Amino acid sequence: MFPFVSSVQEVRDAKNLLLEAQEELTARGLRVPDVPVGIMIEVPSAAFTASLLAKEADFFTIGTNDLIQYTLAVDRTDDRVSNRYEPLHPAILRLLRHVRRAAARQGIVVSVCGEMASDPLLLKLLIGCGLREFSMTPGAIPMARRVVKETSARQMMRVAARVLTLGTVEEIEQYLSEEVAKNEVGSEG
């Protein structure tokens, strides 16, 4: 998987280096397996050109921590501005949807890694955005299993569709809190 990709040319250059390495190993008499090529979507330029990048890759992984940081120009480790690190920012949610759709159109798998998938409500929202593969710390796996088992993807798709029409983090938080109060948003049954 190629990290911090920002352009199609970078992917092509990296794939050429990979091919050269495979040819060198084959020339030495070694058997080289087919290696799927993945792209980390971590910067806005990669997210915005996802439809082009999808033609060059076998899969995407969206690195939400970096994508949020670089899209919002906020250093999540700097206490002076880290409060502006907003996973629910409309731009972030729209980028996630855009990348998922681009991958789907090209028929490639897209997964999500980062802290978003480790938060129960955000995980439900990611499911509502059509994302189905997640990477997280081992400690978050039991929670994620429970959330996935209890979540109605259909209901969360409705919630996500509404969330994607809202213009501010505050409006999104308000809507989600109302949904939670109504019926534990996204739960089966």
Where are these regions (language model features)?
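Conserved alpha/beta-domain cores
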Residues: M1-G189
